[in-house]
Amino acid sequence: FPNQHLCGSHLVEALYLVCGEKGFYYIPRMGIVEECCKGVCSMYQLENYCN
């Protein structure tokens, strides 16, 4: 899972993959778009948005 740009449905799919059964915030906290779509984010950073 390399650092990558993740926007829209790709971001949601990545969150499902990373968070699994824990789930994630339905409305992600502010910052995930800036971090992962405008910038790049890692799997470790995505885990911060899991429940």
Swiss-Prot record:
| InterPro entries named in the record | Insulin (IPR004825), Insulin-like (IPR016179), Insulin-like_sf (IPR036438), Insulin_CS (IPR022353), Insulin_family (IPR022352)
Location, primary (coarse class): secreted
* A GO molecular-function descriptor: hormone activity
Can you name a GO cellular component term? extracellular space
| Membrane-spanning intervals of the chain | none
The UniProt keywords, alphabetically, are: Carbohydrate metabolism, Disulfide bond, Glucose metabolism, Hormone, Secreted
Where in or outside the cell it occurs: the entry states: Secreted
Q: Is Disulfide bond one of the keywords?
A: yes
GO biological process, alphabetically ordered: cellular response to oxygen-containing compound; glucose metabolic process
The intrachain disulfides are: 7-37, 19-50, 36-41
Main function? Insulin decreases blood glucose concentration. It increases cell permeability to monosaccharides, amino acids and fatty acids. It accelerates glycolysis, the pentose phosphate cycle, and glycogen synthesis in liver.
Q: How does it assemble?
A: Heterodimer of a B chain and an A chain linked by two disulfide bonds.
Task: Indicate the family of this protein.
Answer: Belongs to the insulin family.
Identification of the protein by name:
Insulin
The organism named in the record is Ornithorhynchus anatinus
